Design a protein with these regions (language model features):
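Catalytic or ion-translocation cores adjacent to nucleophile or general acid/base/metal-coordination motifs
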Residues: 2-34, 149-161, 322, 328, ...
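Oxyanion-binding "anion nests"
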Residues: 507-570
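Short glycine/serine/threonine-rich phosphate/pyrophosphate-binding segments
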Residues: 1, 132-134, 151-154, 315-319, ...
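C-terminal non-catalytic interaction/assembly regions of soluble proteins
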Residues: 151, 158-280, 547-691
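Helical "lid/coupling" subdomains associated with nucleotide-phosphate turnover
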Residues: 2-201, 205-246
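N-terminal low-complexity or amphipathic/hydrophobic leaders
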Residues: 42-56, 61-64, 71-78, 299-351, ...
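Glycine-rich oxoanion-binding loops at beta->alpha junctions
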Residues: 338-383
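Core active-site phosphate/anionic-ligand binding loop and the adjoining beta-turn-alpha structural block
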Residues: 434-518
Length: 691
C-alpha cells in the first residue's frame, strides 16, 4: 500500500500463475496458506498446505468438531481463542512449533517477494486467516492487525469507487489521436458519473492508445475513470430486482469438481546471483576460450538486451523461450571474443526487420535463419565461420545465438555488434559509417515461404527503404541477412563486447531482484557501465501519456512522463544518484527506439537532456526491467536511464549524420554527449581459464 492509501500497481510485467498477461492490476503475490490450510505431521517434518479445507473450515477443523488438522487448529493450540480449545489439547508441542516455523517461513518469503527495498517495512494483516500469521516477521518493522481485520473484504467493497470504461476503435484519417483520446477520456468520465460517481472526484486510472496492426488509420483507445460513490445517485427498484438472491445462492452452493492436476515445476536450477560464474572453457582443438551459454546466461542476456534496445529491437521474451528450449533439448550455444577470430573467417550477420508492436503480438519463426540460407545459396557458401548480431538491442541481440546454436549452424557468436544499441534501420550501423556499401547482397525471408534477394544499390539508405516496403507487404516482420563481413572490419568498425555488456546489465537486474533493490537498479547499471561519468538517471516519474502509430514498418509515437507526488512513491529514499531533471514532465518521442528526452519544466521552458546516438532506456521502477514500445502504458512508474554511446557514433560527423537526431527527422536537435564512453569488459576473457 502506498502512502496515498491506494494499493501499489503491479509492474509493467504482470504474471498470473506464472503466465505473463497484458493487464493492469494491483501487485498481488499469492501462496497456498490460510486458516484452512491442512497440516500434515510426518516422522521428520510438518507440512502446511498448500491444499485447504476452504469454506468447510467451520465443520472440518478440529476446533470446530471436525477431524482435519488445520493451520487454525495450530493457532488455537498456540494460544488463540477460536472454537473449542480442548479439542486440540492433544496436539504435541513439537507439532505446534514445527508448524508455526513453517507458517513463518512461508509468510516471510512472500513478504520478501513484495518488497522493492531491503529496509524493514510495516505489514498490515487482514482477513480471517490473518490469525495464523506470526507476530514477528523478518524484514518487517511492525505487524498491524486493524479493527475489523477479519471482514476486510466487506469493508473494501463498501468503500470501493465507481468506474467507467471506454474501449473504442476510431479512424485517424479525419481526426488526430489526441482528439480521439480526449473523446474517450470524456466518455469514460461520463460513464463513471452515470454509474453513480461524484463528478468532482472522478480521475482517470488508465488511458492507452494502440494502433491496429495490418489496418490503415485505425487506432484502439481504452480509457478507465474512477470516482467516489455519490449517495445522491438514483437507482430504480427494477434495477435492484434484476439480481436474484436465489440464483446467486444456487451458483455459490454448487460443489466444484476437483481434478487432479500435476504440479508445474520450473526445471531451472536455483542460482546464487552473487557467486555465479559463466562457463568459459578452452576449446581442446583450437585452444580458443569459448563461453558456453546456460539458461541463467540467456535470462540475463535477454534482460540486458532489452535495456540496450532503448525501447526497440523487439521484445526478447519469445527469443529467450526459444533459446531456453534449445538448451533443454541438449544443444549448445557458444560466444567467443573478437580477438579469437581468424583473419579468414566468414562472418554472417543479420536480424529481424519490422515494427516492435507487431513483434509483440506475432511470434517469430525461423526468419533470420531462412534469410541466411537464402544468402548462402546465392553466394554459394556451404556454411560460415562466425555469427554476429546486427544490433545488441532487443530481440535482435539474441538472433546470432539462435542461428549459431548446434540446433542450426553450430557456429560461435562473436562478442560484438554494429550498433551498441538498437536503431530502426539497417543503414544506421557503424559499418555504414566507416565503409558504405556493405549491406548488399542481402536476403529477406518472411518465415512462411517468401524470400527475396537484393543484389545492388547506389546507397545504403535505399536498401532499408526498399526492403522495408517489402517487409510491410510480407507481414511487417521478416528476417534479413546482410553481406558477410570479416574479422578486420569487425575489429575496426563494430562496437565490441556488447554481448558481455548485455549480460552484465541482466545480472544487475537479477541481483536487484534478489536483494530487493529493484528501485535502484538504474544506479547499479550505471556502476556497471562505467559510473556516473558514463551514464545518468535522467528522470523519475509516471507515464501519463502514450501515443503510437504504425507507418512503413515502424512504430512512431511519444510518451509523456510526469514527476509524481511523494504520496505516490513507495520509498522516499529510493534513489542513489541525483536525476538530471526534476519537476515538470519528460517527453520521449520514438521511432521504434527512443530518440531524445525533452524536459518541460513547470514554467514551460524546455531542455533536451539526452538524445541519440546516446542510449535512452525507460525502466520499470518496480521490477528494474526495461520497457519497450509495446509495454509503454499509462500509470506505470518508470526511471529513465541515459547511457553514453560508443565513440564509433560520436567521433565523426558521418557517425552523427547517420546515428544522430537529424537522421531521425529532428534536424533542430543538437547532440551533446551525455558523458564518456567506457568499453565493456569481455566476459570471455575475464572468466577464461588459463591455457
Amino acid at each position: 500500500m502506498l502512502p496515498s492509501g491506494f494499493p501499489r500497481q503491479a509492474s509493467a510485467y504482470v504474471e498470473v500463475a506464472g503466465v505473463k498477461i497484458n493487464f493492469s492490476m494491483p501487485h498481488v503475490e499469492s501462496i497456498g496458506l490460510g486458516g484452512g490450510s491442512i497440516v500434515r505431521v510426518g516422522d521428520s517434518e510438518v507440512t502446511v498446505g498448500p491444499d485447504s479445507v476452504g469454506h468447510y473450515l467451520s465443520t472440518k477443523a478440529r476446533v470446530f468438531g471436525g477431524d482435519v488438522l488445520t493451520a487454525t487448529d495450530i493457532s488455537v493450540a498456540a494460544g488463540q481463542d477460536i472454537g473449542t480449545k480442548d479439542l486440540v489439547k492433544d496436539v504435541s508441542l513439537r507439532t505446534v512449533t514445527l508448524a508455526e516455523a513453517k507458517i513463518k517461513a512461508l509468510v516471510e518469503r512472500v513478504v520478501d517477494q513484495m518488497k522493492t527495498s531491503p529496509e524493514p517495512l510495516p505489514v498490515l494483516l487482514v482477513g480471517g486467516g490473518s490469525v495464523i500469521a506470526p507476530k514477528i516477521i523478518a524484514g518487517v518493522s511492525e505487524v498491524i492487525q486493524p479493527p475489523f481485520h477479519s471482514v476486510a473484504n466487506a469493508v473494501g467493497a463498501a468503500i470501493s469507487k465507481i468506474g467507467g470504461t471506454v474501449d473504442i476503435i476510431q479512424n485517424t484519417a479525419e481526426q488526430t489521436i489526441a482528439q480521439i483520446t480526449e473523446k474517450a477520456k470524456q466518455m469514460a468520465v461520463d460513464r463513471a458519473v452515470a454509474a453513480g460517481a461524484k463528478r468532482d472526484t472522478v480521475t482517470l486510472a488508465e488511458v492507452d492508445a494502440m494502433p491496429l496492426q495490418y489496418v490503415v488509420n485505425q487506432v484502439r483507445v481504452i480509457a478507465r475513470a474512477v470516482g467516489e460513490f455519490s449517495s445522491d445517485a438514483f437507482y430504480s427498484d427494477a434495477a435492484v430486482n434484476n439480481f436474484s438472491a436465489e440464483d446467486d445462492d444456487e451458483i455459490y452452493s454448487e460443489e466444484s469438481v476437483k481434478q487432479s492436476q500435476a504440479s508445474i515445476i520450473d526445471p531451472r536450477p536455483i542460482v546464487d546471483v552473487d557467486t555465479y560464474r559463466p562457463n568459459v572453457v578452452n576449446n581442446p582443438k583450437t585452444g580458443i576460450p569459448e563461453w558456453f551459454i546456460t539458461e541463467t546466461d540467456v535470462e540475463w542476456l535477454a534482460e540486458g538486451c532489452y535495456v540496450l534496445g532503448c525501447a526497440g529491437g523487439g521484445s526478447p521474451f519469445s527469443e529467450y523461450i526459444k533459446l531456453r528450449d534449445i538448451l533443454r533439448a541438449g544443444h549448445t550455444i557458444r560466444v567467443i571474443d573478437s580477438s579469437s577470430m581468424k583473419d579468414s573467417d566468414v562472418i554472417y550477420w543479420g536480424g529481424h526487420m519490422g515494427s516492435p508492436a507487431v513483434s509483440n503480438e506475432r511470434l517469430s519463426a525461423n526468419e533470420t535463419e531462412e534469410s541466411m540460407r537464402e544468402l548462402m545459396e546465392y553466394l554459394r557458401h556451404d556454411s560460415f565461420d562466425v555469427a554476429m548480431s546486427l544490433e545488441i538491442g532487443g530481440a535482435n541481440g539474441l538472433q546470432p545465438l539462435l542461428v549459431g546454436s548446434s540446433k542450426h549452424f553450430d557456429r560461435p557468436t562473436v562478442d560484438a555488434d554494429w550498433m551498441g544499441r538498437a536503431y530502426p534501420t539497417y543503414w544506421q550501423t557503424t559499418i555504414c559509417v566507416y565503409e558504405p556499401g556493405q549491406l548488399v547482397p542481402c536476403a529477406l525471408a518472411s518465415g512462411d515461404g517468401k524470400a527475396m534477394i537484393m543484389t545492388k544499390t547506389t546507397n545504403d539508405e535505399i536498401v532499408d527503404r526498399a526492403l522495408r516496403a517489402a517487409c510491410t507487404e510480407m507481414g511487417s516482420r521478416v528476417g534479413m541477412t546482410a553481406k558477410p563481413t570479416t574479422k578486420k572490419k569487425v575489429i575496426k568498425y563494430s562496437v565490441l563486447n556488447t554481448v558481455s555488456l548485455a549480460w552484465r546489465i541482466g545480472r544487475c537486474i537479477a541481483r536487484a531482484k534478489k536483494h530487493n533493490t529493484s528501485s535502484t537498479v538504474a544506479e547499479q547499471i550505471i556502476d556497471e557501465v562505467g559510473g556516473p561519468d558514463s551514464a545518468k538517471v535522467l528522470f523519475r516519474g509516471k507515464i501519463i501519456g502514450v501515443e503510437r502509430r504504425l507507418w512503413k514498418g515502424h512504430s512512431y509515437g511519444e510518451i509523456t512522463i510526469q514527476q509524481v507526488a511523494d504520496d505516490e512513491l513507495e520509498s522516499a529514499s529510493a534513489s542513489g544518484y541525483k536525476t538530471v531533471a526534476t519537476g515538470g514532465v519528460l517527453k520521449i518521442p520514438f521511432k521504434n527506439e527512443n530518440i531524445y528526452a525533452k524536459h518541460v519544466k513547470d514554467d514551460g521552458t524546455e531542455d533536451i537532456v539526452a538524445c541519440v546516438p546516446d542510449l535512452i532506456a525507460v525502466l520499470d521502477t518496480q521490477s528494474g526491467k526495461a520497457l519497450g514500445v509495446p509495454e509503454y502504458r499509462y500509470g506505470v512508474m518508470v526511471t529513465v536511464l541515459g547511457i553514453t554511446c560508443s565513440p564509433r557514433w560520436s567521433d565523426t560527423p558521418k557517425g552523427l549524420e547517420i546515428g544522430g537526431p537529424a537522421a531521425m527527422g529532428y534536424k533542430d536537435v543538437v547532440y551533446k554527449p551525455l558523458g564518456n564512453y567506457v568499453e565493456p569488459k569481455s566476459v570471455v576473457l575475464e572468466y577464461a581459464p588459463p591455457k
